[in-house]
Amino acid sequence: MSAREVNFDGLPGLTHHYAGLSFGNEASARHQHQVSNPKLAALQGLKKMKTLADLGYAQGVIPPHERPNIEALRQLGFSGSDAQVLAQAAKQAPKLLSAVSSASAMWVANAATVSPSVDSRDGRVHLTVANLNNKYHRSIEAPTTAALLRAIFRDDEHFSVHDALPQVALFGDEGAANHNRFSNGYGEPGVQLFVYGCAQAGGIRPLHYPARQTREASEAVARLNQLDAARTLYAQQDPVVIDAGVFHNDVIAVSNQQTLFCHQRAFLNQPQLMARLAQKVPGFNLIEVPDERVSVADAVATYLFNSQLLSKDNGKMLLILPEEARRHAGVWRWLTEMVAGDGTIDELKVLDLRESMCNGGGPACLRLRVVLNAQQQAAVNPAVMMNETLYATLCGWVERHYRDRLSQADLADPQLLSEGREALDELTKLLDLGHVYRFQQ
């Protein structure tokens, strides 16, 4: 059966701010304590979604989470009214307040790992929510992520949304950001590649930054998603590039259908892995960027590989890049030479995602790829699918509710909490989500 890839982008939330919460993410650390613009972040995200929809790609939206997360603060011993909880946290533990106020759920490449029905034993689309165990501010996302995904993929005949793995380091799981799928056509059986940073059994690990994904987690996700072991591969990301700021594999590699676009140093034992992929994937097409042309540091600084690789009607592919890639002379020179070479990628499109990029999230971070056939796409909650009307509606919603300036000091303002709840309550009606947030229950 024919199928297509549908991109679901995370919408930046009302508390988008720069707190430097993500050790190992160099952009996050570099912009710590700068003043953010949540309204601009959301509008940039919506413009990205609208751009893809206008190009003919199926595009959906995943709503933000409620932040600050008052229940998380109560679990950590703060008490009283919501305003009192915020005041106590701001005075006693401002870093915790920042963590429970993070808008990091916008990077939905970390929301779940998705496997299409053609690869799953029961013929359903499987989505396993990521536990994001390595960072506290992200580990609290899983329950709301599961609720949102079940409100979008709500037909159990077609979809199976699995809860996150146990919240322990052994099963550290970062979702689709460490997962690639290869196939001749979207509707044909594929080969799934899970990328991990470390394994309990041993082997080398990064020395400076944490390896967020474990092999044990990847294997568990493959089991939950009911994958064929013969069509499932596991590969370790090179620990040296993790220490260089490649905290997820999607910062150093991106795939689409039979094509893998990656850096020469993305994987441990890379030549052997490429040979295995060539054996497993008919027509495997490797676009490997040499280290001598683009260093790992420049790849991280520009998010060259944290891009979206999209199939076109002419059989070629379009690469969606952040503005930072165009501003780097060496990276842009390599890209323009590649396109001029009449290879697989014949078009580049640059988007301004500055607000997200300053926190270390590029085009690929903001989207969750879901391969759907026609029946499955018809079963998706239609209210979340991007079109002219929804774009105008959501832009108006952002203009009404979002602040255009936010510092860490603002997180203690009870009015910000009220503004967020009012906005999300309205959004659940606009997107026909039901009562997915705790404050609504």
UniProtKB/Swiss-Prot annotation:
Keyword Disulfide bond: no
EC number: 3.5.3.23
Binding site for substrate: 19-28, 110, 137-138, 212, 250, 359
GO MF: N-succinylarginine dihydrolase activity
GO BP, sorted A to Z: arginine catabolic process to glutamate; arginine catabolic process to succinate
Pathway listed: Amino-acid degradation; L-arginine degradation via AST pathway; L-glutamate and succinate from L-arginine: step 2/5
Domain of life: Bacteria
Catalytic activity entry: N(2)-succinyl-L-arginine + 2 H2O + 2 H(+) = N(2)-succinyl-L-ornithine + 2 NH4(+) + CO2
Hydrolase as UniProt keyword: yes
Function: Catalyzes the hydrolysis of N(2)-succinylarginine into N(2)-succinylornithine, ammonia and CO(2).
HAMAP family (alphabetical): AstB
Record-stated family: Belongs to the succinylarginine dihydrolase family.
Protein name (record): N-succinylarginine dihydrolase
Upper taxonomic lineage: Bacteria, Pseudomonadati, Pseudomonadota, Gammaproteobacteria, Enterobacterales
